[in-house]
Curated annotation (Swiss-Prot):
GO terms for molecular function: small ribosomal subunit rRNA binding; structural constituent of ribosome. GO terms for biological process: translation. It comes from Pseudomonas aeruginosa (strain ATCC 15692 / DSM 22644 / CIP 104116 / JCM 14847 / LMG 12228 / 1C / PRS 101 / PAO1). The gene is rpsT. The keyword Electron transport does not apply. InterPro entries: Ribosomal_bS20, Ribosomal_bS20_sf. Residues 1-23 are annotated as: Disordered. It comes from the Bacteria. This is Small ribosomal subunit protein bS20. It holds the Pfam family Ribosomal_S20p. Belongs to the bacterial ribosomal protein bS20 family. Binds directly to 16S ribosomal RNA. Gene3D superfamilies: Ribosomal protein S20 (1.20.58.110).
Length: 91
């Protein structure tokens, strides 16, 4: 446990950051989940709309360091590939 006043303050700040970052990570997962649900339902329009909404959120979290930039790129790439496969299957 923190003994000095500065260590107590840092512990409090770290806990505050941890909970805020957890909230942001949860938000990213929700956006990704919305795209996946639309893909699973084979709803191309809804999937594209959800993907369009998710991309800026994923990028923003990568810029802030909430998720790694490579992880953001991997999510976008895989979701984009699934949507592309869905559109070719529908055509």
């Amino acid at each position: 446990m923190a003994n000095t006043p500065s260590a107590k303050k840092r512990a409090k700040q770290a806990e505050k950051r941890r909970s805020h970052n957890a909230s942001l990570r949860s938000m990213v997962r929700t956006y990704i989940k919305n795209v996946v649900k639309a893909i699973d339902a084979k709803d191309l329009e809804k999937a594209q709309a959800a993907f369009t909404a998710a991309v800026p959120v994923i990028d923003r979290m990568a810029d802030k360091g909430i998720i790694h930039k490579n992880k953001a790129a991997r999510h976008k790439s895989r979701l984009s590939g699934h949507i592309k496969a869905l559109s070719t299957a529908a055509a």
